[in-house]
């Protein structure tokens, strides 16, 4: 029998594949970011080095296929396609929340298939902050072992939990548990927002807690509050529907969140990454890697080759952006100046950041 968590996972996958679930009136902010064009790059585009060391593992490009799904039998071919594409192109990949496999161990194969199809890739596990108090360190270690994970993402989806009728709305004690997990396990821990962004205040807390990386998961991409609107309509839950509509675009946009989160930790830029230029802008703004989920949902339902086609295009766009900025490797792009204008600049200046420093050589706030 399929449990509630497993059923919800397949509902989420279908909604993301078939319904408009992206932000409506808020943007990730990449239109406010201008890379500095070098008219004479003095580089051979075919010889650029896109590879990077990320949390102890070398990947061929600074990109991760973000957590999408798992926990239902129908998700096995989806995760297999995603993982096989990641393995072929040498990028990283995350699994969806492994909660369903804790509730029902028969669902483990829907997650384990990722490591089976991507034996050499950077693979991260995934569990919600609301669940780690229940699972404890021992339970978290089981999730890591399940997929031989290179890292574990603890996702922060309290916006979705607040909207979801069956959501877990108790966030007390999560930071202490994150701190305990970081001190007890050897595997790197990533704290991952899921669409509402990370503030400066929280980035500092996570750094003190001992996490290894922060995935900013900013507003401007998939809205999980929006996803829950469709579920609420289906169940005729008018309160949850109203909450989801109101908070559809809530949160800190991705670009602003990247700047907010610039502490001495690797950053992952997620939220509205839709092309290689977005990836390049993210790296120039300080991210160690970028990631996306929604662009691969539809292709993953078609199979590996469709995922490879979409991802290859994004990576070629990324390479072109590096070339046109005169950057031969990722370190060069990290130090490449950028100009931030518009709403994003206004927001960041009101938050106390001097964005003009980003436009200077060295690109340091």
From Swiss-Prot:
The entry marks the following residues as binding FMN, namely 67-69, 97, 126, 192, 222, 272-274, 293-294
GO molecular function per UniProt = FMN binding; isopentenyl-diphosphate delta-isomerase activity; magnesium ion binding; NADPH binding; oxidoreductase activity
Chain sites annotated for binding substrate: 8-9, 97-99, 160
The residues the entry assigns to the signal sequence are none
Q: Its Enzyme Commission number?
A: 5.3.3.2
Q: Which UniProt keywords apply?
A: Cytoplasm, Flavoprotein, FMN, Isomerase, Isoprene biosynthesis, Magnesium, Metal-binding, NADP
Name the needed cofactors: FMN; NADPH; Mg(2+)
Q: Which InterPro entries match?
A: Aldolase_TIM, FMN-dep_DH, IPdP_isomerase
**Flavoprotein found in the keyword field:** yes
**Per UniProt, where does Mg(2+) bind?**
161
What is an example of a Pfam family matching this protein?
Answer: FMN_dh
The reaction(s) annotated as catalysed by this protein in its Swiss-Prot or TrEMBL entry are: isopentenyl diphosphate = dimethylallyl diphosphate
What Gene3D superfamilies does the entry give? Answer: Aldolase class I (3.20.20.70)
Query: A cellular component term (GO) from this record?
Result: cytoplasm
Q: Can the keyword Flavoprotein be found in this entry's annotation?
A: yes
Subcellular localization, as worded in the UniProt entry: Cytoplasm
Query: Which GO BP terms sit in this record?
Result: isoprenoid biosynthetic process
Q: Which family does it belong to?
A: Belongs to the IPP isomerase type 2 family.
Q: What does this protein do?
A: Involved in the biosynthesis of isoprenoids. Catalyzes the 1,3-allylic rearrangement of the homoallylic substrate isopentenyl (IPP) to its allylic isomer, dimethylallyl diphosphate (DMAPP).
**Which NCBIfam families does the UniProt record give?**
IPP_isom_2
Stated name of the protein: Isopentenyl-diphosphate delta-isomerase
Taxonomic source organism: Methanosarcina mazei (strain ATCC BAA-159 / DSM 3647 / Goe1 / Go1 / JCM 11833 / OCM 88)
Q: What lineage, starting at the top, does this entry show?
A: Archaea, Methanobacteriati, Methanobacteriota, Stenosarchaea group, Methanomicrobia
């Amino acid at each position: 029998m399929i449990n509630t968590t497993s059923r919800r996972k397949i509902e989420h996958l279908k909604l993301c594949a078939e319904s408009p679930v992206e932000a409506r009136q808020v943007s990730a902010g990449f239109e406010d970011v201008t890379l500095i064009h070098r008219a004479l790059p003095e580089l051979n585009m075919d010889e650029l080095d896109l590879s990077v060391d990320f949390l102890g593992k070398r990947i061929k490009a600074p990109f991760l296929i973000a957590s999408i799904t798992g926990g239902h039998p129908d998700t096995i071919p989806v995760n297999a396609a995603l993982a096989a594409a990641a393995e072929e192109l040498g990028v990283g990949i995350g699994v969806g929340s492994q909660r369903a496999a804790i509730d029902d161990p028969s669902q483990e194969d829907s997650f384990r298939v990722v490591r089976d199809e991507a034996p050499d890739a950077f693979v991260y596990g995934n569990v919600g902050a609301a669940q780690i108090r229940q699972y404890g360190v021992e339970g978290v270690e089981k999730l890591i072992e399940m997929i031989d994970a290179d890292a574990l993402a603890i996702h922060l989806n309290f916006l979705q939990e607040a909207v979801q009728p069956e959501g877990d709305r108790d966030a007390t004690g999560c930071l202490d548990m994150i701190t305990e997990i970081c001190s007890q396990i050897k595997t790197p821990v990533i704290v991952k927002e899921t669409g509402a962004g990370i503030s400066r205040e929280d980035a500092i807390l996570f750094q003190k807690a001992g996490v290894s990386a922060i995935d900013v998961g900013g507003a401007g991409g998939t809205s999980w509050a929006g996803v829950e609107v469709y579920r609420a309509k289906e169940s005729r839950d008018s309160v949850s529907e109203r909450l989801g509509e109101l908070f559809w675009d809530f949160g800190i946009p991705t670009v602003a969140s990247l700047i907010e989160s610039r502490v001495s930790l690797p950053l992952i830029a997620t939220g509205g990454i839709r092309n290689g230029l977005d990836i390049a802008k993210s790296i120039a703004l300080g991210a160690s890697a970028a990631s996306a989920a929604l662009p691969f949902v539809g292709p993953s339902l078609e199979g590996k080759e469709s995922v490879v086609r979409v991802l290859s295009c994004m990576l070629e766009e990324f390479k072109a952006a590096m070339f046109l900025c005169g950057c031969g490797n990722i370190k060069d792009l990290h130090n490449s100046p950028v100009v931030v204008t518009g709403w994003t600049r206004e927001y960041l200046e009101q938050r106390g950041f001097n964005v003009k420093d980003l436009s200077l050589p060295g690109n340091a706030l």
